[in-house]
Amino acid sequence: MPMTATMAPYTLFILDDDTPLNPREDHDCLGKMVCWHSRYSLGEKHDYDEPSDFLRNLLFSEYSSGHDRNNPVFAFLKSGKAKDARLEYNRSTREWELRENQHWSSDSDWYVSSSYAASLKDEVPDWFLDDCLSALTTGELFSLVEQMDGMVILPLYLYDHSGITMNTCGFSCPWDSGQVGWIYADKAMIEQEHGKITPEILEKVRQTLEAEVKEYDYYLTNQCYGFQFFKEDVEVDSCWGFLGEIRDVQDAVKEHLPEDCNPAIVESLQFQYEELDIDEYLERLQEETEELDCEPG
């Protein structure tokens, strides 16, 4: 809804931005936003068919070619805490065996789906790591991703009812909302931006990701604005691409005012509830000014 204010000779308009820039495509963001939805294209583009594919890729990139059989993925499988998979040493064959649960009715439900020779010691094949990751549930994969060194990852929730809105904490209505993905920054991304990683830096990154989600939510909820500034009937300045609460937009507009314009013009902005035609509005102002000038003193 447009807003207008006049302090002669200036008139200020704050207007809806009908062609706003997508902050996930057009802004320099620290985090990457990976989402899945049947009707909406959200966040950055990606090629992951399912959330588990994304999580497996993060873990494979972190631990492949490291040839360390004591990495967190193998340690988790050895602990017996995984729901449907475990990693065990077979003394007879001298192999490490990945066993998976077929969900039948006895101990025979567990079968060997993959193995590698213990003689390789720490030279664990990457294909075996891939097999192990494929045996884990999405929840187990996410738990391991959270433990990655230097990783900051936050869930993304979408509420879809007469429009869409997004946050990182979830919504109270389970029928119209649910998790659609994550926003994350890994160790390499954080080091490139901040250098050495410390607990304070990780908290700063978390706050940055929260702010990026909030900015994207402004875009999704059409809280996108621009302004046009006129001196009498001549446009002297304009700017578009403001995202945020209207109060924040008003504060940002103050920075664009000419020196001879009273900043109070921003505080005097009023919503226009009828359709606004700027040319007609300015013409009407001019007529009113001329009428006042013609009145006998």
Residue ranges, per PLM feature:
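Acidic interaction surfaces
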Residues: 1-297
